[in-house]
Every structure is written in C-alpha cells, then in structure tokens.
Design a protein with these regions (language model features):
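Acidic, surface-exposed loops and disordered segments
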Residues: 2-362
Length: 362
C-alpha cells in the first residue's frame, strides 16, 4: 500500500494564482460560451444525468444553473455529488477555454442544488478570464475520456500516472492514496457487490435507478441522458428484468448468476485509489469536482481509465466498512470522499450527451 507524499513535483498540475498567459502568441480571440460548452458537455456527471445549464450574461460572464429534474432525491438527497459535478463542468469549460488562452473561474456560489425545486435554478456565477499559465491538459481529452466499467487487463496503473494524480490532489489540498494489494482490492470489490444488492432491495432506490437506466441504444439515443446499459457492461434485458422483476433475482441460481456476472466485470483490477477531502460546504464539493475533473483528464491523457466506487461512498454500511479498512490520515478532519479503481482496458462505449443548445438557456 502506498501513501503519496505531499510534494508539488512539477508545474504540470499547479493550480495557483493566475498570471496572464497566451497559448497562441498574439491571440486576442475570446471564445464563445457556445464553443466551450460544445467541449465541456462531454464531462462526466452523476449517472450521466447532466443537470448543468448555462445562462450567458455577456461574452465573459455566465450563470451556472441546474435543472432539478436531473437530480437524485433518493441516491443523492442533499445533492452533494451533483454539486461536485458543477465543479467538474466548470473545470471542463476552463480546459476548453485554454485552447484560446483563457480560463473559466467561479466568482460566487449563489444558490444550493435542491431537488424539490420545480424550475431551472442558478447555482454560481462564472467568468472567462485570460489564462495565468499554460494548460497541460488538452481539450481533446474531454472527448477522449470515458468510464470503463468492464474488466481491466491486470496491469497496475503506472507510477507516472499515480504521481500525476497525487500532484493534482495535493494542489487542491487533499490527500491521495493508492494500493495494489490484491486482498484489499478483492475486499473492496466484495463490499461494492454487497452494497449493490443492498441498494437493489430498496424499492425507492430501484425505482429511481429504473427511471434513469436506458435499456437499449434507441432509449439512450432518444434521452441522451442517464445510464446506457451497454456502458455498464450489462445486457439491457437483464438489467431491466433485475429492476422491474426484482423478486426473481433475490435468491437461488439467478441471484448467484447475477453476482458472478457483476463480479466478472471487475476482473483484472490491479489498482485502487481513494481521496480524503473536505466535504462540509458547497465550496468544498465544487472544488472537489474541479479536482476530480483534472484527475479524470490525466487518466485519459495517459490512456488509462477510472471507475468510481460510488456505492462505497453512498451506501452507509459499505462506507463504514471501507472507512475502517483503508489507510487514512487520522489527524486530518477531512473525510474519505472518493474511492475508485483504475487501470487499462479495451475502449468502452461512450455515453450520449444532450446537445449544446439544450445546455445553454435562452
């Protein structure tokens, strides 16, 4: 097991104060918000629901909004993780803007994500400013990045990638850990599997997930939001049966078959990682999202994939087991905020996205 040191290794991932920098010598072109959203819309979001919306105020100012229809009253009742996604989307806009020598930054959080709202609501003000530094992450990574939920090839994540990810976390004042210990990996996969079946036993959770799964390419292409079962590595008919005929899968041979099938999608996992990060305020969660975006893009840059262990964070019993098992900095008040597996696999399918003109508000 490895705990990465608290050192900034290179300027590659420095997130410090900006000083003017132009990626194109002499360029004064201000990119349109539409052009930036066209790249940033490929950013990851919770269950691919894409709640983010953008209200343009001027060529350099906008209001980041959210559509409450795409929040999760059961799975994310306080919208903690969707708040983080607002940070992911903002950082994606910034990476896209770097192509023109600009960056996008949040100036003020003006609202709180609330699934009880009935209309699109504001969350934060953002602005387009001259970049302070050269952006090491290409905007093409926003489209190249994918989540691989399939089996990996058994190779541990490279030390260079782990070091780069640690530097990113350090720059955001978090703490990064990773492990290649086979027993620990097997244990995390085991409790992840247990938490899945525990969640499936909850009718409200089943109904919420059933409403966001897309069981065929036609459904996925029509909605352009939600979890396409092909991206989950499961046949659509199987997943639909599990959610809509749950009693058939709670015992006996079918339950064992489902367990083995799900376990098989984790084969070849040779690296797991986790992050301690402040998780009290909306600012904390937003900044976590910015950090997570950069980690994910770094993985894509290095031809690696990451698969978050979402259940291990949101399921209380699984979280307690994991929290009591993993190496953590006990002197830090920051909680365990994120866990994942990472490695190398065949290129997974890409989820659909809603078009730019649906994200930008009129």
């Amino acid at each position: 097991m490895h705990r990465r040191s608290f050192l900034y290794r290179t300027a590659l991932v420095s997130i410090g104060s900006f000083l003017p920098f132009w990626t194109r010598a002499g360029s004064t072109e201000i990119p349109s918000w539409e052009s930036l959203v066209d790249w940033a819309r490929w950013a990851p979001s919770v269950h691919n629901l894409q709640a983010h919306r953008l209200k343009i105020v001027s060529e350099t100012e906008a209001v980041l909004c959210y559509d409450p229809k795409f929040l999760l009253p059961v799975g994310d009742p306080n919208s903690d993780f969707n708040t983080a996604v607002m940070g992911v989307f903002t950082e994606s806009l910034s990476i896209a803007a770097a192509h023109y020598g600009f960056a996008v930054r949040k100036t003020e959080i003006i609202g709180k994500l609330d699934h009880t709202m009935e209309e699109i609501m504001p969350f934060a003000r953002i602005e387009l400013v001259p970049a302070q530094r050269k952006e090491p992450l290409s905007r093409q990574l926003l489209k190249d990045r994918r989540t691989s939920r399939n089996n990996y090839d058994g190779k541990p994540l490279s030390a260079l990638t782990l070091n780069a990810c640690e530097d990113i976390v350090n720059a955001f004042e978090g703490q990064f850990f990773s492990s290649e210990d086979e027993d620990l990996i097997d244990y995390l996969i085991k409790i992840n599997q247990e938490s899945l079946f525990e969640d499936l036993n909850s009718q409200p959770m089943r109904e919420e997930l059933d409403g966001l799964f897309r069981y065929s390419k036609k459904e996925a292409e029509t909605h352009r939001t939600g979890l396409w079962t092909k991206c989950m590595g499961f046949p659509g008919k199987l997943v639909k049966s599990v959610f809509r005929h749950h009693n058939r899968w709670v015992k006996g041979a079918r339950k064992q078959m489902l367990k083995q099938y799900y376990r098989g999608t984790f084969s070849g996992t040779a690296t797991v990682g986790w992050i301690q990060y402040p998780w009290t305020t909306n600012e904390d969660k937003f900044e976590f999202g910015r950090m997570l975006c950069r980690i994910w893009m770094q993985m894509a840059n290095d031809d690696a994939y990451m698969h978050p262990f979402g259940n291990l964070i949101t399921n209380p019993s699984a979280f307690e087991k994991m929290n009591n098992t993993l190496e953590l900095n006990k002197e830090s008040a920051a909680p365990l905020a994120f866990a994942f597996r990472a490695g190398y696999s065949k290129q997974p399918p890409r989820s659909f996205r809603i078009p730019t003109n649906k994200i930008i508000l009129s």
